[in-house]
Amino acid sequence: MANESTDVSKLLERITIDPDICHGKPCIRGLRYPVNMILELLSGGMTNEEILADYNDLEAEDILAALAFAARLTQVKRVQAAL
């Protein structure tokens, strides 16, 4: 379990937040690829391989990092409907 936690921590280091890049949205390695864009591509049905082919400067670990970041965000104690 500790090894898994270390792996996730290593992945999360790939996520950067810089007010000068994409208006401060969480991005992949300081590049102009917001985490939400990666998640939208995946939820739209693109495979990891298709994403990597379309965005040459991304690495497989970047996609895993986006998923790990999203998973971490869902670990909240309470979610309030935004309706």
Each model region followed by its residue ranges:
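Small, basic N-terminal interaction modules of short regulatory proteins
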Residues: 1-83
